[in-house]
Amino acid sequence: MPFDVQFLKVFDGVLMLFERAKAVFPGGVNSPARALKHLPTPLVAKAASGPYLYTDRGRLVDFCLAFGAIILGHAHPKVRRAVEEQLARGWIYALLTEEEVLFAEKIRAHVPSVEKMRFVNSGTEATMNAVRLARGFTGRDYIIKFDGNFHGSHDYVLVKAGSGAATWGIPTSAGIPSDVVKMTVVVPYNDVDAFVKAVREVGDRLAAVIVEPIAGNYGLILPEVEFLKALREETERVGALLIFDEVITGFRVGLGGAQGLYGVVPDLTTLGKVIGGGFPIGVFGGKSFIMDLVAPQGPVYNAGTFNAHPVSIAAGLAVLEELEGGQVYSVANDAARRMAEGIRDLAERVGFDVVVKHIASMFQFYFKKGDVKTPQDVRESNEKLYLKLHELAIGHGVYLAPSQFEVNFTSAAHTAEVVEEALGALEKVFRELRREVGGNS
């Protein structure tokens, strides 16, 4: 059967499935980032293994990796075996297990600031409870967050950034009462002066500052070290807590996370993604005397039937054991470095202005001149060009992060051969993009 006829048959089937999906899900998907609105239909996953996704568009080298949840590679045999062994013993008890204690001990060994912790089921739950705990501990109500930082979909943090140095309580979602977010202040990321000014304005009403130490939800924005140090100094000065949201960076940029990388120690930390091995999990934790306020020991309430779910714990233990072996980071980090260098070189050769950002096993690129140091720099990039490249890349067997506001990731399965395969495909993509749009970005 000719390829074009086969393609039409596949596309027609996906179109029918998407219509069925739209009949039962808002927008046809169960999370907005999966909608891929720049494509005729969302991608439909069939399977995943190693560095590859198998979809209705064929086999794709995956650089999205479930938005950073996968670091060993898809369907890693040790994770699969650990999960199968747990399933054979039962998959939910709602009781204490030895495995969750062992998992917590391993996390604490690598992230010493997390002396005690509570397992929850997502990054959103983790940050929501961390903010609640900070308010309960300090007896204060106000929090500061940063433009371009995403901390989940709960009401405390869905707050807009404005045009001034600080924005006070403007919800980013319908359905959030203004009274809920009026005590959330948004400040520009990487701007020490604006942050110090906001802290002085809030003063002794400030309960916490929550930040992504490496911003990974608005593209990839690396922190100025002095910015992170200022967060620590100012929160200590006014008696507020510093919360590092390491849902993306925890165990991704190293065993000690971003706090280990930069040497800035928070009071509370949130974790997720990598530590679940692809299964739902979240963690909030910190100094013992703060965490002791969490129920049942203290008055700050958290509970959940699925907290410390045995299957997620089993997967997480398998992942941490692999990470402790040392080879995962060297392979994954080298892959991201080579992808970043390769994309920069390809764009230059074809005649596009790009800015490439990279750290550990994370990278992203932007069609623009200059540099990317703030969310505003990301907003000023050519998003349409990125989306067109993303669409073309799928046709050549590469699945990149679906927006310039997301991040590309690599795993231990992204060997030198896989990177070479991806860069070979992207060379064709960049040349095709150049023919379509012409000129510089």
UniProtKB/Swiss-Prot annotation:
One of its GO terms (biological process) is protoporphyrinogen IX biosynthetic process. It comes from the Archaea. Keywords: Cytoplasm, Isomerase, Porphyrin biosynthesis, Pyridoxal phosphate. GO terms for molecular function: glutamate-1-semialdehyde 2,1-aminomutase activity; pyridoxal phosphate binding; transaminase activity. The keyword Isomerase applies. The modification N6-(pyridoxal phosphate)lysine is found at residue 273. The keyword RNA-binding does not apply. PROSITE patterns: AA_TRANSFER_CLASS_3. It is found in: Cytoplasm. CDD domains: OAT_like. InterPro entries: 4pyrrol_synth_GluAld_NH2Trfase, Aminotrans_3, Aminotrans_3_PPA_site, PyrdxlP-dep_Trfase, PyrdxlP-dep_Trfase_major, PyrdxlP-dep_Trfase_small. Its cofactor is pyridoxal 5'-phosphate. Pathway: Porphyrin-containing compound metabolism; protoporphyrin-IX biosynthesis; 5-aminolevulinate from L-glutamyl-tRNA(Glu): step 2/2. GO terms for cellular component: cytoplasm. It is an enzyme of class 5 (isomerase). Its EC number is 5.4.3.8. It catalyses: (S)-4-amino-5-oxopentanoate = 5-aminolevulinate. HAMAP family: HemL_aminotrans_3. This is Glutamate-1-semialdehyde 2,1-aminomutase.
